[in-house]
């Protein structure tokens, strides 16, 4: 009996005090990238949402090295999503005994890190001129490691 090896770990940040829309702008830039490239991007981006996301990515990598004994150079951000949390409502005192409501949005961020060195190999058939001939009894099969969602984020986001 074969047991499937676990290749993904995750880190979850809940009730982070920022808008989900602003966090998604940063998350869309790191999805599908390698761990080291993600850390460089997050250090250089000038947004407030980068620091909590940086901490989550770092935590996910620490989980991967502790739970799976994986190397940081083999890690890829396979899934990163942001969902809206609760809205914290406060009252700000104003003039003449009045108050003004303040809505403070929160969000939940989950980051899934995958170790590509533990992935299964994908069989790739190279085109052989003798592949269709009946004389050839055994086909040559080459295996190459490939990661499907490596470059799926669609380019660099520009600020509007």
From Swiss-Prot:
Pfam families: Ribosomal_L22 (PF00237). CDD domains: Ribosomal_L22. One of its GO terms (cellular component) is large ribosomal subunit. Keywords: Chloroplast, Plastid, Ribonucleoprotein, Ribosomal protein, RNA-binding, rRNA-binding. It is found in: Plastid, Chloroplast. GO terms for biological process: translation. PROSITE patterns: RIBOSOMAL_L22. InterPro entries: Ribosomal_uL22, Ribosomal_uL22_bac/chlpt-type, Ribosomal_uL22_bac/org-type, Ribosomal_uL22_CS, Ribosomal_uL22_sf. Coiled coil: none annotated. One of its GO terms (molecular function) is structural constituent of ribosome. This protein binds specifically to 23S rRNA. The globular domain of the protein is located near the polypeptide exit tunnel on the outside of the subunit, while an extended beta-hairpin is found that lines the wall of the exit tunnel in the center of the 70S ribosome. Belongs to the universal ribosomal protein uL22 family. Part of the 50S ribosomal subunit. This is Large ribosomal subunit protein uL22c. It comes from Panax ginseng (Korean ginseng). The lineage of its organism: Eukaryota, Viridiplantae, Streptophyta, Embryophyta, Tracheophyta. The gene is rpl22.
